[in-house]
A protein has these predicted regions:
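General small-molecule cofactor/ligand-binding pocket signal
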Residues: 35-37, 86-90, 139, 179-181, ...
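Structural alpha-helical scaffold elements that stabilize or flank donor/cofactor-binding regions
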Residues: 6, 100-101, 145, 152, ...
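Short, structured interface segments
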Residues: 125-144
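Glycine-rich, Arg-bearing micro-motifs that act as flexible, cationic patches
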Residues: 110-129, 148-149, 255-280, 290
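Structural beta-alpha unit
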Residues: 1-2, 22, 41-44, 49, ...
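Small/aliphatic-rich secondary-structure junction motif
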Residues: 1-54, 151-200, 230
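A short acidic, glycine-rich active-site loop
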Residues: 54-68, 199-212
């Protein structure tokens, strides 16, 4: 996967501005180009036209203002970062226009929040629908970029999504520290205790599961990268959501790369772990939206 073409969907909010600047950092690092896209909602435009029938120039004025604002944003990004940036204004249904534009990009980049809490409820719904339907990786930017990504966390569950998420992490970052993490549990541990299996035997069983997971992580890393020393591995017992958020804090992660964790119904659902991380993490989250095979 290349990162030659990055699409930023912007609503002119501060968070969308952070997303645009993160895209510029990635574009400058990878030699790519970014496009800023603003979608004017067709229903909103129709309502404006109906409301101001006596002012036929209102629609044209709005369109011109949006184009000028977006063009200036692209020019500022190019001047500040050196990244090639262009802009485009579309009119239509927001979700459909973004999805259509993303088909010609290598990655879709979004800000985490909108301008205000009420609007954010709507944007949040749009973002989740995008994650369900988009065929490109989706980067959700949560804070202003501070240079290149330096500490990347990749949670894995050994599903087919794990390898593609790890591959994605290596392509997005050039010199970052990458930590691959897995949370495990002990099957039937409670029943083993009820069956009077000794604590020592259960602990031995737990250690075996942990070692097996470590072996799988190292095999996974070797399948996508030649240099094992570029990666760290973490295998701990517990809930994956808690482990991911704890490791984010401990490692000072500035990016989490995670799969959508779907299966046959992945077009209808975003996995609960992925949704939880998107909601509760402090750092940026890159979601691999590819289908499991």
């Amino acid at each position: 996967m290349t990162l030659r073409s990055l699409l930023v969907a912007t609503d002119f909010s501060d968070d969308a501005g952070h997303a645009a600047h993160r895209a510029a950092v990635l574009a400058a690092e990878k030699g790519g180009q970014l496009e800023l896209l603003h979608v004017i909602s067709r229903p909103s435009l129709d309502a404006l036209r109906d409301m101001f029938r006596s002012h036929p120039g209102a629609e044209a004025t709005l369109m011109d203002d949006v184009r000028v604002t977006l063009s200036k944003m692209a020019e500022d990004i190019t001047r500040e970062t050196g990244a090639a940036a262009n802009s485009r204004v579309a009119v239509g249904y927001v979700l459909d226009e973004i999805l259509s534009a993303s088909e010609h990009a290598d990655m879709l980049i979004l800000g985490a929040h909108g301008l205000n809490p009420l609007r954010d409820l709507i944007l949040g719904t749009t973002a989740e629908r995008l994650l369900r339907r988009c065929k490109r990786p989706v980067l959700v930017v949560k804070r202003p970029p501070q240079g290149r990504y330096s500490n990347v966390l990749v949670p894995v569950d050994f599903s087919p999504h794990s390898a593609t998420a790890l591959q994605l992490a290596t392509r997005v970052t050039s010199h970052a520290n990458i930590t691959v993490a897995h949370a495990f549990d002990v099957p039937f541990e409670g029943k083993l205790r009820l069956a009077d299996v000794s604590v020592e035997e259960i602990e031995h069983y737990r250690a075996q599961i942990q070692q097996q997971a470590l072996g799988k992580i190292r095999s996974l890393i070797q399948s996508v990268h030649d240099d094992m020393h570029s990666f760290k591995d973490v295998v701990e017992r517990g809930d994956p959501r808690r482990l991911i958020l704890a490791k984010e804090t401990q490692l000072g992660a500035d990016l989490i790369v995670i799969g959508k964790h779907g299966s046959m119904i992945e077009d209808l659902l975003i996995g609960s772990v992925t949704r939880h991380i998107l909601s509760d993490s402090k750092c940026d989250v890159l979601v691999d939206t590819s289908r499991a095979k």
